[in-house]
């Protein structure tokens, strides 16, 4: 019985999702032209790749993104990328978007700000401007 209980406990520990807090970006930010281009590229994905996370510096100049190349992806550990951003820019960095939902809290955007991958570049830029990111 102890053996079965130990195995069940081990399986639960190995298969559980991590609910650690993600460092979401906050504060006023204006995306640079390059960051906007990267965001558009990230939102659209290529082939079977699906957007996973878009990391941004608080000055809007540094950005990077993660893709999910498989169907059932779990969130990755973005902290090394956020730390690299902070080391490179000497500013605060955080997650700007998870999948196609903008998480950055600038006090202007609506709670549920989602970018459609079928929107044109101009439509995406217009929404970013409306939400206070341009």
Language-model-detected regions and their locations in the chain:
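Sec-dependent N-terminal signal peptides
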Residues: 4-15
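Secreted/extracellular ectodomain signature
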Residues: 21-134
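Sec/Tat signal peptide C-region and signal peptidase I cleavage site
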Residues: 16-20
